[in-house]
Amino acid sequence: MNVDPNITKYMIKAKIVTDGVVEKPDVVGAIFGQTEGLLGDELDLRDLQKSGKIGRIEVEIDTKKGRTEGYVLIPSGLDQVESSILAAALETIDRIGPCKAKVEIESIEDVRINKRDRVIKRAEELYRKMGENGKSLSESIVQTVREEVEKKEIISYGEEHLPAGPAIADSDSIIVVEGRNDVLNLLRYGIKNTIAVQGTSVPKTVKELSKSRTVTLFVDGDHGGDLIIKEMLQVADVDFIARAPPGTEVEELTYKQIIKALKYKTPVEQYLETHGMIEELKEWSSRNTKELEERQGNELKNERPEKINENEESEKNVELKEGSVQKLETVPEFDPSSPESIKFKLKQLYESRELELFDGQSSVGKFPVSDAIEKIESMHGDLLITGGIISQRLLDIAYNIGVKAIYGFKIGNITKKPDDIKVVAWDHI
């Protein structure tokens, strides 16, 4: 059924039934003829149609077995009240052509609802299309930014040309990650003191950096991360360990996840104790030391082979004398005023991962680094030597118990240091 598209508000739908055969012109004529003068001049159908307030009347009828049935559709631009009056007037029609007829209003539909439905549906289509275009545009922008960041900020560092952040050369503390994408992701959130090992084999550059910097090892939360931790602990000096959430990689972490992981990084001593790796690490250290000594011994033999075979009898005598001396040799007494004595003590504590508190020359107590802070809180002393990192918390506790000097293997992130306490790292003794 074709409906005038210019209708504005309502569609009056009336059902007609006649007891004889009629045609469309008969129906239209009956509508105009039998309602003329019924509703006054204001609602006269002819005038309303001329003024455009009533659209073209559409008639759909079908004749069967001597009866005619069908529908009449009248588009109305009138308001609800006027449209209802006009619809009621149609039901007064009792004859169409020569036949008796009955007219019944089935509905008065608000066509604006249909319009709104079409508007909503079309708006959804347009929004979806706009969203797809916007998404591709935003993805393009993100990719461009990533490329620019990578191009301008990632540098190649060391003889192995390792991917690193621009602050790697000047930072006292560094973050060691696995690959280039990890460095890029941290750069994206403003973390610039990073360097990548590019695999599980630790490069010489990273080993050398670990000797003079505070090192945080930041690895993926998978088996690959475990392997990198083990490798780094064997050949480099790691201070803290941070891990991505289980099953995730550093390169895919959000800013919030990165900050949380770095905030709750674990001191290496605590990590070793928690994971039962202390004995394993000692075994690695012993093996590495032995290999180094053997390598140095071989180099010495190659440099002076002629002296090794000279006067074997004299060598035996010397060895015998040295053996006698070794039996009588004792550990030198600790002297807090001697840098050599302090360095010797610090080396011992580093190897055993312990902390020792002194009052003058006397030892007040020696404890594992992992739980030493809680142990010394109730003690008193004037000198503290730790085989671990001098942290802000350790410094605060030491100051509170009267310590005047702290010696440690490394100095961590100290933001507040009292003027009357001395803080010294291994390489400054």
UniProtKB/Swiss-Prot annotation:
SUPFAM superfamilies referenced in this protein's UniProt entry, alphabetically: DNA primase core
Keywords of the record: DNA replication, DNA-directed RNA polymerase, Exosome, Magnesium, Metal-binding, Nucleotidyltransferase, Primosome, Transcription, Transferase
UniProt binding sites for Mg(2+) 2: 220, 222
Leading EC class: transferase
Gene3D superfamilies per the UniProt record, alphabetical: 3.40.1360.10
Cofactor(s) needed by this chain: Mg(2+)
One cellular component (GO) term of this entry: cytoplasm
Keyword Transferase (UniProt): yes
EC numbers on record: 2.7.7.101
Record region (Disordered): 287-322
Record-level GO BP terms: DNA replication, synthesis of primer
Reaction(s) catalysed (UniProt annotation): ssDNA + n NTP = ssDNA/pppN(pN)n-1 hybrid + (n-1) diphosphate
Protein name: DNA primase DnaG
Gene that this sequence comes from: dnaG
